Regions:
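Catalytic loop of short-chain dehydrogenase/reductase
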Residues: 127-167, 177-184
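Catalytic Tyr-X3-Lys loop
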Residues: 92-111, 129, 153
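Conserved mid-core segment of classical short-chain dehydrogenase/reductases
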Residues: 83-100, 142
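Conserved glycine-rich Rossmann-like NAD(P)H-binding loop of the short-chain dehydrogenase/reductase
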Residues: 29-45
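Amphipathic alpha-helical dimer-interface segment in Rossmann-like NAD(P)H-dependent oxidoreductases
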Residues: 71, 105-126, 161-162, 166
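Rossmann-fold cofactor-recognition segment
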Residues: 49-63
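Conserved glycine-rich cofactor-binding loop
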Residues: 15-16
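C-terminal helical subdomain
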Residues: 175, 195-248
Length: 248
């Protein structure tokens, strides 16, 4: 899929952070982009950056939204970035409601959209990318069920890939696990929480993380992934400022 011209790309969670960078990168590469998010002003600002971007104001966790948009646009590229901000507290200060926030959003979004991608199904050769998190591998003790929800997203992506293979659908599904970054709401919350937990300033904590992953870097990395030969793609990748890396 080296030429993205005319290949409709739906980016779910495109209004800010990495999702915004991904939407802009695909639009600049010539793809007609459908940017999905709940925030009207942010979507309008994004759409003003490129004639290739159109917007859909919707709740990504609503199953009818997933069905409607997959049916209407029949995307050849589907990128799932949307999710909830975790409640940053130690385990003992969580309630079940705060602990499970990401189970009811991030996991539901991955399940709902992947289900629709398989049921429609998307056209043969389509690519689906689920943006999970590095927390899926490393854990995140100050964010309740966040890391577990991201690990489950990774599993669901692998399940969807297997179902595509079994049914001969030709859809490639991949999980991408970005490292914590200050260029998004979740990352900023995490940086504040873990800096305080370690008795550091935010600047000190950021410094030990190394070069931060930017929205532009994320966009470039996902372009490379979508353009790659499906036969060379593995089920999941870590994403840092250095690009996509296979988990060790």
């Amino acid at each position: 899929m080296s030429d993205l011209s005319g290949r409709t790309t739906v980016v779910v969670g495109a209004s800010r952070g990495l999702g915004r960078g991904i939407a802009r990168a695909f639009a600049e590469a010539g793809a007609p982009v459908v940017a999905v998010a709940r925030t009207v002003p942010a979507l309008a600002e994004l759409a003003a950056t490129s004639p290739n971007i159109r917007t859909e104001v919707a709740d990504a966790a609503d199953a009818t939204v997933a069905w409607n948009l997959v049916d209407r646009y029949e995307p050849e590229v589907l990128i799932l970035v949307a999710g909830a901000n975790p409640v940053m507290r130690p385990l003992q200060d969580q309630t079940w409601e705060t602990f499970s926030v990401n189970w009811h959003t991030d996991v539901k979004i991955a399940f709902t959209w992947l289900r629709e991608a398989l049921l429609k199904p998307l056209p043969p050769g389509s690519r689906v990318v689920v943006m999970s998190s590095g927390a899926a591998i490393n854990g995140s003790p100050a964010s309740g069920g966040y890391a577990g929800s991201k690990a489950t997203q990774r599993f669901i992506a692998a399940y969807a890939q297997d179902e595509s293979r079994r049914a001969g659908l030709g859809i490639t599904v991949t999980a991408v696990m970005p490292r914590m970054t200050p260029f998004g709401d979740v990352g900023r919350r995490g940086i504040r929480a873990y800096a305080a937990r370690g008795g550091q300033t935010e600047e000190e904590y950021l410094k030990q993380l190394g070069e931060p992953l930017t929205p532009q870097m994320a966009g470039a990395a996902l372009l490379d992934l979508v353009r790659a030969d499906p036969a060379t793609i593995v089920p999941g990748y870590l994403l840092t400022a250095a690009g996509l890396q296979k988990p060790s």
